[in-house]
A protein has these predicted regions:
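Gram-negative outer-membrane beta-barrel domains
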Residues: 110-120, 130-188
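Transmembrane beta-strand segments that form the barrel wall of outer-membrane beta-barrel proteins
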Residues: 38-50, 81-83, 125-127, 163-176
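Short glycine/proline- and aromatic-enriched beta-strand/turn motifs that initiate or cap beta-hairpins
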Residues: 20-68, 180-188
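Outer-membrane beta-barrel domain signature
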Residues: 29, 47-54, 70, 91-97, ...
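Short loop/turn motifs that connect adjacent beta-strands in outer-membrane beta-barrel proteins
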Residues: 25-35, 51, 68-75, 113-121, ...
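Residues that define the transmembrane beta-barrel architecture of outer-membrane proteins
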Residues: 34-38, 53-59, 98-104, 119, ...
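Gram-negative (and chloroplast) outer-membrane scaffold detector with strong preference
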Residues: 46, 57-136, 187
């Protein structure tokens, strides 16, 4: 056997043994009663005033803990925080405006227990409070405002765990972000 083939064979044996070590101790069980997860991601947010057609970058973080078994899944409770920004230039009138949203809230979700190792799918509702700094830039007669508003929505998401503690996560919905992707960490 030549040296290159030996190196490839040793690497393959190492990779297989590493994957068996990562998954040792049974199947990946993403969410169960008593588990804690933390999500952090980036996405597309929207402003909450005006026509709702504007999108901008957003940062979102959330945590959840498994509370109750319900059928093949688990009900979780947790919290979330989102920061989003939107800016628009109305070229016809040469007028700029911008929104900066901070949303803090509680969330509840139902995590369905598929028989696919590492997969977690869920849907839920957030409730909270939002703070919006709105500036009308150079529009004559407007100085902007900073309202506080109630916040509610709906979301659907999925996580896939590569190990017992780390995975990827994505959510869509009418939420503090319309879509986001990030990482998920399972603490317990």
């Amino acid at each position: 056997m030549n040296n290159k083939l030996k190196i490839i064979l040793l690497f393959a044996i190492y990779a297989v043994s590493l994957s068996r070590t990562t998954y040792a101790g049974g199947p990946l069980d993403p969410v169960r009663v008593g588990s804690w997860t933390i999500n952090a991601g980036v996405g597309v947010g929207a402003h909450y005033f005006g026509n709702g057609a504007g999108f901008g970058p957003a940062l979102k973080g959330s945590f959840e803990t498994g509370m109750w078994d319900l059928g093949p899944g688990v009900i979780t409770l947790g919290g979330e925080a989102t920061f989003s920004f939107f800016s628009h230039n109305y070229g016809v009138d040469n007028w700029n405006e911008s929104w900066f949203n901070v949303i803090l809230g509680a969330r509840a979700a139902y995590h369905y227990g598929w028989n696919v190792e590492g997969l977690d799918t869920y849907g839920g509702i957030p409730l909270g409070i939002g703070f919006c700094a709105h500036g009308n830039g150079d529009y004559p007669g407007n100085s902007g405002y900073t309202p506080v508003y109630p916040y509610a929505g709906i979301f659907f998401g999925a996580s896939y765990f590569f190990t017992k503690t780390i995975g990827i996560n994505g959510e869509v919905g009418y939420n503090s972000t319309h879509a986001n992707i990030g990482v998920v960490f399972k603490l317990k």
